[in-house]
Amino acid sequence: MLQQAIDRDPVDRIDRYPTRTAEPAPHIERLDPTVWGEVHSEQLSTFDRDGFSIMENLLSPEEVSEFRAEVERLAADKSLLDDERVIREKTSNRVRSVFEVHKLSAAVADLVRQTRIVGLARQVLGSDVYLHQTRINYMPGFRGTGFYWHSDFETWHAEDGMPAPRAVSLSIALTDNYPFNGSLMVMPGSHRTFVPCVGATPADHYRESLREQEIGVPSTEDITVLAQRYGITQFTGRAGSALLFDSNVMHGSANNITPFPRSNIFLVFNSVENTLVEPFAAPAPRPTYIGSRDFTPL
C-alpha cells in the first residue's frame, strides 16, 4: 500500500540532528542505538562497534554472473535512455547509477526479499523493514568518478525526512574490489558521530547531488577530525562479498583510474518504525524513486 508522509505527534518533528546550517555547528554524538535488536553474534557486535560488517560470499559465483549480466542489460537498455532513474556521469555521460532497480529487475526484486538479505536488516534494526532506496552503481575503468565523504543519513534526514538513523545499507559487490580501483572507504566507529553540514538545500538538489554532491558534505576540517579519531579502512574483496553499513557511517570513494571496473547492487532498508516525514532541511521531498514513501514491510 502506497503511503504518503504521515502527520505525527509534534514531538516526532523535533529535529535531533540539525544540518544544512548557515554556520558551522558542533558534531552531535549519536542519540540513538546502533543496533536496535539484540547483539547475539560476532557479526552484530562488529556492526555495533564499527558501524559496518563485511560478509564474504553472500552471492555465489553463479549468482554474481547472473546479476552482472542483469546490470549490464539495464545500463544498455535503450528504453531507459531518458528515464529519470538513470543517473549519468557529469563529464562522460556514462551511466553512474540506476535507481529503483527492484522495480526494473525481477531478479533484484526476488533478491531483496530473501531471508539472507532482508534478515540482516531486521537483525540490526530490531523491526520489520521496508525498502527506502535501491540502485545499481557503476564505476567504469579509467574514468569512474568516486563519491566524496558523506553520511547517507545526513542526506536522508535533510532531504527525505528520515527522523533517525535507524536504517542500513547493503552494498553487494558484482566485481572484485581492490584497494586501487575506487573501493569504498569507511571510518570505523564514525556512525556514533553526526556531522552537521553547512549550506541551505536548493530546490531539486538531487539533480546535481546524485552526479556530484557539493551540499550535504562535511568540511575538510570535519573529515580531518573524524579520520584522526576513527581512522580509515577499505571494503575490498571478491565479487559476491557484501558490506552492511549503518546509515550514518562516514564513507566515500576515490576515482577509478585503473582498467578494472566496479559495480554493485545497493539496497537501503529502513525500519517501519522510522518512516519518512517532511524533509528536515529541504524545500520538498526528493522523488519517491530516490526516497520511497511506500512503507509496506518486506
From Swiss-Prot:
Keyword Ribonucleoprotein: no
Annotated GO MF terms: 2-oxoglutarate-dependent dioxygenase activity; iron ion binding
Cofactor(s) demanded: Fe(2+)
Sequence positions that bind Fe cation: 150, 152, 251
Catalytic function, reaction form: L-ectoine + 2-oxoglutarate + O2 = 5-hydroxyectoine + succinate + CO2
Keywords: Dioxygenase, Iron, Metal-binding, Oxidoreductase
Annotated site residues (Important for ectoine stabilization) in this chain: 156
Cofactor note: Binds 1 Fe(2+) ion.
Matching InterPro entries: EctD, Phytyl_CoA_dOase-like
EC number: 1.14.11.55
Basic and acidic residues biased stretches: 1-18
GO BP terms, alphabetized: ectoine catabolic process
Region annotation (Disordered) ranges: 1-26
Residue sites binding L-ectoine per the record: 133
Record's function text: Involved in the biosynthesis of 5-hydroxyectoine, called compatible solute, which helps organisms to survive extreme osmotic stress by acting as a highly soluble organic osmolyte. Catalyzes the 2-oxoglutarate-dependent selective hydroxylation of L-ectoine to yield (4S,5S)-5-hydroxyectoine.
The protein's assembly and partners: Homodimer.
Protein family membership: Belongs to the PhyH family. EctD subfamily.
Protein name: Ectoine dioxygenase
Lineage: Bacteria, Bacillati, Actinomycetota, Actinomycetes, Mycobacteriales
Gene: ectD
